[in-house]
């Protein structure tokens, strides 16, 4: 299959320099030993930051504190739309984590699954590929203040082929993984295959490519946070000064390096932040986690670490300590809440295996 409608990237000196800088940080990060308990806490916090930041770009009004509270709330309660959006993104990140464990390749099905998670709770027409508009109506992204069409994406009939081209590109190209991630981000935003959730889906799928090729830095840090610092620059870089109509240049932009350089610059900042965080946060994060534990819970954690019990069942540990199974489960629950343990579901029994 030809991939005529996927942006072509020429590797300029600036692009190569940025890739080299990111690769250098990636190598440096690989030399840092971090205990699993610290990684788990940092990953959870990073997913929260990404969920908040990615939705903030789209105009979600929640503060970061409110977003975190929504993520941590009982899933059975009723959520307002902004809260549901943040929760959806967090769950989509968890979903992609599971895909990554299986090393699932990038596919159209994966894109559709992710968008359905992003739009969970929305009306049916907002989930899945957009269809034809009523006669006399134009599908476009409009400026909320002026009402002018900011972007007119491709016709709905072209979307399946454009997505097929993107999937073909991702799975056959020999481009550098950072370039692939940038291209996926641009193409999904530009193809605009859905009625809603395009930007969030693009950021999630681009992030999956980074994770797949080892540029997600173990899930630590938030790239979305850097995009959210200046949404105007983010959108301007995607638009590249081109006309609003997709068919008038955005399908084959003359200067794709505008977007690529922006994306790599954000990646560079992100990689530096992750490196600094990984170098300095070990003791701070552990101290912060332990401050929420009482003496018995700290003693329990120390026991697990001393005995190198990185995987265990509560019943096993209860026998070792001479306490009830319920006591161990209660202590495990507190450690789970503080990101110090990860429950693994075996068959139907939650907490039947704990991984520290």
Residue ranges and their predicted role:
Residues 1-354:
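FIC/Doc superfamily catalytic core
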